[in-house]
Amino acid sequence: MKILITGAASFLGRHLVEYFLSKNEEVLALARENARGMEELLKYKKNTGFKLTVLNMKDIEKLEDEFDICIHLAWGGIGKTGRMDKDIQTKNIVAAKNLMKLCKKKNAKRLLFAGSQAEYGQTLEDMENIYGKDFDINAIENQDENSSTNPKSEYGRAKLELKTELKKLGDGLNIEYVHMRIFSVFGRGDHETSLVSSCVNNFMENKDVYIGECLQSWNYIYVKDLCKAIYLLTVKELKNNYVFNIAGEKNQILMGYVRDMHRILKSKSNIIVEKREAPTEGTPFLKPSIELLKELGFKEDYGFEGGIKDMCAIK
């Protein structure tokens, strides 16, 4: 099958390109000009199953190639300011709808869209108001695909709007729509300022780590496990389900992940906790259920510890 991946130069996009090529699938990678990560894509140019197209999403109708499956990752305004910019997020909505229409013209049968945990909008502040500051994480229900949604950002609201709009549009065009609610992904090539990247870099050099309280529930999925999950969503019969949480099998307090990294890397660093101001949209509180994904046969190959060891080349 031939897979179109938009946002292919992104952290997730590059790993998906590599994964699908390893499965001997054809990959049509779409990336905007001067995209960060473009050089990483160029190393696949000698692969006969790979084609790179440099094109902005606003010009998506100019794409010439046909494809069977589309994985839509491209999205503007993912930074702190952009997440709250309604105009930017509205442009993302328009682009996604245009892509669905293009899928019809290109005879594609399924479109997978990168939704987000931000659609739920559940925050640490919400949980503390309900359960108190000494809450028991195990007493709080997991977020399944039918849990209530209350996005706190324009980014989350746009992703949630497309859950309904793309499903309706896809049904009318006879294209199967899959809405992937992706949680927190880590791995080699992620931004150096991400929590995992910064902790790993400092712990490996035995440098002290200055960090917030990390009291919220969290869920990490290793990028190679995420690729496996997305691959299953391209090839499996989905039994009329179309919204899937894409996350790891383990939920725990975020500080637990920090201490796990410290242990795995056998670091001598000090973990110095600082009181920090909560983000504008609140402190995300992630506690997903992935039972629907497991029904498709998903099981982590790496998990958190295996992922840290793999990205750091530790046996």
For each predicted feature, which ranges?
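N-terminal Rossmann NAD(P)H-binding glycine-rich loop of SDR-like oxidoreductase domains
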Residues: I3-K23
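SDR active-site strand-loop-helix element
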Residues: T6, L30, C70-G76, L111-Q117, ...
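Conserved glycine-rich Rossmann-like NAD(P)H-binding loop of the short-chain dehydrogenase/reductase
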Residues: E25-R36
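NAD(P)H-binding glycine-rich loop region in Rossmannoid oxidoreductase-like domains
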Residues: T53-K91
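Conserved Rossmann-fold NAD(P)-dependent oxidoreductase catalytic core, especially the SDR/UDP-sugar
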Residues: H72, K97-E154
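Glycine-rich NAD(P)-binding loop of the Rossmann-fold in SDR/ketoreductase-type enzymes
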Residues: D87-A95, T149, S153, R157-A158
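NAD(P)-dependent short-chain dehydrogenase/reductase
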Residues: E125-F135, L160, T164-W218, V223-C227, ...
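C-terminal substrate-binding subdomain of Rossmann-fold SDR/epimerase-dehydratase oxidoreductases
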Residues: K207, I211-K315
